[in-house]
Amino acid sequence: MNKLTIVGAGLVGEAAAQIIARDELCRELVLMDVQGELAQGKALDVWQAAVDSGSDTHVHGGAKAEMLEGSELVVITAGVPRKPGQSRQDVLSTNLPILDSIMADIKHHAPTATVLVVSNPVDVLTYRAWSVSGQGRDKVFGQAGVLDTARMKCFIAEQTGFSARDITALVLGGHGDSMVPLMRYCQIGSVPLSHFLSSEQIEQIVERTRKGGGEILGLKKTGSACDAPGVAIAQMVDAIGNGRNRILPAVAILEGEYGRTDIAMGVPCVLAEKGLARVIELPLDAQEQAMFDHSADQVARDIAEMKAL
């Protein structure tokens, strides 16, 4: 990939930039923020760290929308993070106009760019970004499931003592309390998770995964998760930039899959050279479909709330 722009030089944007630059996932990396000097300073720091790691990625920062020009991929991390006790939906009224402004700049300066939305509430903002972009769902989608899956794998490894490398997991649905971890798809070394853990232990992991972001927020007090989201972003950037055809969970616009349309939900997708190549529709049993429908209904209500603002 030639040029990638991260809009939002906060902790998540900076964490993603560090990995993207270090791993040379693009030739030119731009870190944009309304606080231009902050973006410049962080970009310079990231660039120097990347150089020390042997990377030739050129990193620069600033506030001007013109910096978007030529971007093949734009990652949106800008917005206010939630505070302890807040839900992701609580920051919608603040982050919606921020997203709208960014999308207007993208349409003007980088109209063909692929857009990856990370800002919360990510399901609603992904839907908004897609609806105003004029692009197909292959060009506008969000990041949530890669992070949620990593959290689940972490908790499974902690509970079982097995290497996280051998753990596979999958989370669908909205990014929040209504997410749908598909436990029958969770395995350790190709062995079903139920072979190692009781149903009570598995349910504890499910609940902790749903509350994973809030747990970190409550412990840190002054900031939300940043490092794990940064890694999740970098994974998706790598899949797109290097055309890896990876199957990763993403917040995608559904077109009839899982019985839903006109909604943005976390589902397994194929990420390829130009973006989201396709949505994978898994067969769900009655209980899983009911949980997915519950999650979808919540996201639909959130989208309706967004439209009313």
From Swiss-Prot:
GO terms assigned for molecular function: L-lactate dehydrogenase activity; L-malate dehydrogenase (NAD+) activity
Binding site for NAD(+): G8, A9, G10, L11, V12, G13, D33, N95, V118, S119, N120
UniProt catalytic activity: (S)-malate + NAD(+) = oxaloacetate + NADH + H(+)
Chain segments annotated as coiled-coil in the UniProt record: none
Keyword terms of this UniProt record: NAD, Oxidoreductase, Tricarboxylic acid cycle
Family: Belongs to the LDH/MDH superfamily. MDH type 3 family.
Protein role: Catalyzes the reversible oxidation of malate to oxaloacetate.
Protein name, UniProt field: Malate dehydrogenase
